[in-house]
Amino acid sequence: MSDEEVVDPKATLEVSCKPKCVRQLKEYQACTKRVEGDESGHKHCTGQYFDYWHCIDKCVAAKLFDHLK
């Protein structure tokens, strides 16, 4: 076994996929601004958050298995 440090390719691929998900990120950021002052706790941006990460995960999944051994 080599002494090289193992690098997680998923983290690198996530960074490279973020530019493809700008629309979802902007929707999430707009939502967080809208609900910022909500004292009741009923408003949230869970849907937009998951939409953003779904976009990134979909992009990463197409490339990730090429990097795994």
Swiss-Prot record:
Record's subcellular location: Mitochondrion inner membrane
Pfam families according to UniProt: UCR_hinge
A single cellular component GO annotation: respiratory chain complex III
UniProt-listed Gene3D superfamilies: Ubiquinol-cytochrome C reductase hinge domain (1.10.287.20)
A GO biological-process term: mitochondrial electron transport, ubiquinol to cytochrome c
Main subcellular localisation: mitochondrion
Cystine pairs: 17-59, 31-45
TM ranges: none
Keywords in alphabetical order: Disulfide bond, Electron transport, Membrane, Mitochondrion, Mitochondrion inner membrane, Respiratory chain, Transport
Membrane topology: Peripheral membrane protein
InterPro entries for this protein: Cyt_b-c1_6 (IPR003422), Ubol_cytC_Rdtase_hinge_dom (IPR023184), Ubol_cytC_Rdtase_hinge_dom_sf (IPR036811)
Binding partners and assembly: Component of the ubiquinol-cytochrome c oxidoreductase (cytochrome b-c1 complex, complex III, CIII), a multisubunit enzyme composed of 3 respiratory subunits cytochrome b, cytochrome c1 and Rieske protein, 2 core protein subunits, and additional low-molecular weight protein subunits. The complex exists as an obligatory dimer and forms supercomplexes (SCs) in the inner mitochondrial membrane with cytochrome c oxidase (complex IV, CIV).
Domain notes from UniProt: Lacks the acidic domain of other UQCRH.
Similarity comment: Belongs to the UQCRH/QCR6 family.
Primary role: Component of the ubiquinol-cytochrome c oxidoreductase, a multisubunit transmembrane complex that is part of the mitochondrial electron transport chain which drives oxidative phosphorylation.
Stated name of the protein: Cytochrome b-c1 complex subunit 6
